[in-house]
Amino acid sequence: MVLNGMPITMPVPMPVPMPVPSPPATKSRVAIDWDINDSKMPSVGEFDDFNDWSNGHCRLIYSVQSDEARKHASGWAMRNTNNHNVNILKKSCLGVLLCSAKCKLPNGASVHLRPAICDKARRKQQGKQCPNRNCNGRLEIQACRGHCGYPVTHFWRRDGNGIYFQAKGTHDHPRPEAKGSTEARRLLAGGRRVRSLAVMLARESALSDKLSSLRPTKRQAKTQSIQESKRRRMGASDVLETKQELVVPPTTYLPTSTPTHSTNFNQSQGSYVPAGQGSVISQWNREIHYETEDPCYANGMYSYDMLHSPLSAHSSTGSYYQENKPQQLQHSQYQQQLSPQQHVPVSYDPSQPISSSLQCGMPSYEICDDTSSLTSSSGYCSEDYGYYNGYLPNSLDVSNGSQSQNLSQDASFYTTSSEIFSVFESTLNGGGTSGVDLIYDEATAYQQHQQQGTFPHLTNYQQEPQDQMQSADYYYSNTGVDNSWNIQMDATYHPVNSTDPIYC
């Protein structure tokens, strides 16, 4: 074309790719007229070959030996449709998936994918990106309208030795890709997804292994914390035991009531001073005293100097004696071994240890009868038979070698009870004389037996005081535990001297 003397090149229109047209109608080799809805199907001896892309109005008879015919297979995307006749299977065409941009593949073919049978999956296919990498189009469905505006319909029926197929309508859309190729592509895509998933799992496993190596698990951490706290507690207990072994406890005193005779009565003073430097709160007036002298009692409530009694710790809080430590027990045993060979000293030393035979007072197997009456002494009391030395003068006390060495202190005595102070307080403080003298006949006999069997070397020291003290007509006995009194009579009482001191 020439315009104003200049040739003009006309643009050549680009060819638009057209979908592959449907094949022509399929013809059967069996020239028999029949319909799928007939009550009786004709019998034939020759069968047609299986055709995946049957198109148009056609009737085909397949052999029962054909696998594709038994599966009702077809190249077209067909789905099952409801049918009123249970003997006839009805299927309808779903069309084809095409690219909205009408793109061409490198091999010159157009994009025509097979639609999914499931409605939900088919809806997902619509609007997806075109599988062609060089195309920005979207997939869309071209529906089949080849049967009077409705999808092409296929009918399948099995009767006798043949499978009868009948199609109604002609497909107005290109062929979709074959079912086999679609499945192959899906398998390939699935393999890629599986490989990607395997890579992701491998990476996640490596990451979890690294995290596990960097930090212990929760259970391991809890176990380690429990073991650590247990080791800490054990270490603390070991340190505490070591400290307790290193610390030497101070000398402690247990309460007894061992008064010595005194002529002064003063209730305003009463304090105990332990050995060594320390402070003690008075149990009478709550005053604190700091002393460094030997343990002793000042003039107390009853104006008696308290000696260290070898008796039980359950009688009174008025006096104290030292508990036997291992060193003191060894010293006591050593003193007992030397006592038969040594002479009795003149003075009594209260700081000497107590004999191990009477270190705890009343033994655990002794029982005290708290039901004894004033007119009967039938109730057994351990002090009536075992602790006779508590009511005897110091000269008659042979329970301990170190404590039976004072022959001149006849006025002092031991007792295991403090209740006697409140009952006979006037007598102890220098009251009127009486014929009551606390001497036990059983104690005397027991003492003589012990002197002959265990302490033969003290017989000459004890004989004269015993003869002098057998002078009681009746006496009172108090167990020191139940505050009950027993009265016993002695017909052989002959007073020796009315001026002798009275002991309760």
Swiss-Prot record:
Localization per record: Nucleus
Reported phenotype of the disruption mutant: Flies exhibit failure of glia to differentiate in the CNS and in the PNS, glia are transformed into neurons. Ectopic expression causes neurons to transform to glia.
Keywords: Developmental protein, DNA-binding, Nucleus, Transcription, Transcription regulation
Gene label: gcm
Superkingdom field: Eukaryota
Tissue: Expressed transiently in early glial cells.
GO molecular function: DNA binding; DNA-binding transcription activator activity, RNA polymerase II-specific; DNA-binding transcription factor activity, RNA polymerase II-specific; RNA polymerase II cis-regulatory region sequence-specific DNA binding; RNA polymerase II transcription regulatory region sequence-specific DNA binding
Function: Transcription factor that induces gliogenesis. It determines the choice between glial and neuronal fates. Also has a role in the differentiation of the plasmatocyte/macrophage lineage of hemocytes.
Coiled coil: none
Species name: Drosophila melanogaster
Any one GO BP annotation for this protein: positive regulation of glial cell proliferation
Protein name, entry field: Transcription factor glial cells missing
Skewed-composition ranges (Polar residues): 313-325
